[in-house]
């Protein structure tokens, strides 16, 4: 399968394929935090992220969620549907943590009565600012119907993920999703789902996600390996 690099990101390289509607995503060993300010090469990270994300996306596909995932090609590669990415990070929070706790001056780990969905404008130059529905419409990123769909789909995905992670003894604190338009103009889930873009805590409150790297709490791949081993316990 011939391929040509079309995009190089912080965590993945994206390549063309012989099919104009398909791409290959290659996961890197690079870890970044604070929008790339903190950066490090960590051997084995790409393999673990690809394993975890492929596993989660397969389960989401089976549960009826429309995603870009087609198949896992190798240890670090997966085949995806090509999408036009919507420049929004869709963040869903089940508990207070991270920037939410800083913004509102509250402790981390407080359960939210209703999960909160937030939007962040994907723009590195602006440091991905927190925006609301009206900003999304002003920037012509999405209309009312599309905004409602993104929120509804994030909540639906959350209900699935919460159950799966609870089954393996992990609490899903929050996560970031990205969506895009497929060749037919349908909004589908894209990017990845791994400890890079979610927060997971174990029963003792230990971080099982990229906060280990952000906050210097230990070896990132050790934690990701534990998450991967636990996920394989799911039926």
Curated annotation (Swiss-Prot):
Pfam families: SAICAR_synt (PF01259). One of its GO terms (biological process) is cobalamin biosynthetic process. Signal peptide: none annotated. Its EC number is 6.3.2.6. It comes from the Bacteria. Keywords: ATP-binding, Ligase, Nucleotide-binding, Purine biosynthesis. SUPFAM superfamilies: SAICAR synthase-like. Pathway: Purine metabolism; IMP biosynthesis via de novo pathway; 5-amino-1-(5-phospho-D-ribosyl)imidazole-4-carboxamide from 5-amino-1-(5-phospho-D-ribosyl)imidazole-4-carboxylate: step 1/2. GO terms for molecular function: ATP binding; phosphoribosylaminoimidazolesuccinocarboxamide synthase activity. It catalyses: 5-amino-1-(5-phospho-D-ribosyl)imidazole-4-carboxylate + L-aspartate + ATP = (2S)-2-[5-amino-1-(5-phospho-beta-D-ribosyl)imidazole-4-carboxamido]succinate + ADP + phosphate + 2 H(+). InterPro entries: SAICAR_synt/ADE2_N, SAICAR_synt_PurC, SAICAR_synth, SAICAR_synthetase, SAICAR_synthetase_CS. HAMAP family: SAICAR_synth. Belongs to the SAICAR synthetase family. This is Phosphoribosylaminoimidazole-succinocarboxamide synthase.
């Amino acid at each position: 399968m011939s391929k040509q690099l079309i995009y190089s990101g912080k965590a993945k390289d994206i390549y063309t394929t012989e099919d104009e509607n398909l791409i290959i995503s290659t996961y890197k060993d690079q870890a970044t935090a604070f929008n790339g300010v903190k950066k490090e090469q960590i051997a084995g990270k790409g393999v673990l992220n690809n394993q975890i994300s492929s596993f989660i996306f397969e389960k989401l596909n089976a549960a009826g969620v429309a995603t870009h995932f087609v198949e896992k090609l190798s240890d670090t590669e997966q085949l995806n549907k090509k999408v036009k990415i919507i420049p929004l990070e869709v963040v869903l929070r089940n508990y207070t943590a991270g920037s939410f706790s800083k913004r509102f001056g509250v402790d981390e780990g407080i359960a939210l009565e209703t999960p909160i969905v937030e939007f962040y404008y994907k723009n590195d130059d602006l440091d991905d600012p927190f925006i609301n529905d009206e900003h999304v419409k002003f920037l012509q990123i999405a209309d009312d119907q599309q905004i409602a769909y993104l929120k509804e789909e994030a909540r639906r995905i959350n209900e699935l993920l919460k159950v799966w992670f609870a089954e393996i003894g992990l609490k899903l604190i929050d996560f970031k999703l990205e969506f895009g338009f497929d060749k037919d103009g349908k909004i589908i889930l894209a990017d990845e789902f791994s400890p890079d873009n979610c927060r997971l805590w174990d029963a003792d409150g230990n971080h099982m996600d990229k906060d280990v790297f952000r906050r210097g709490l230990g070896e990132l791949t050790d934690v990701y390996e534990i998450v991967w081993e636990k996920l394989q316990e799911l039926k």
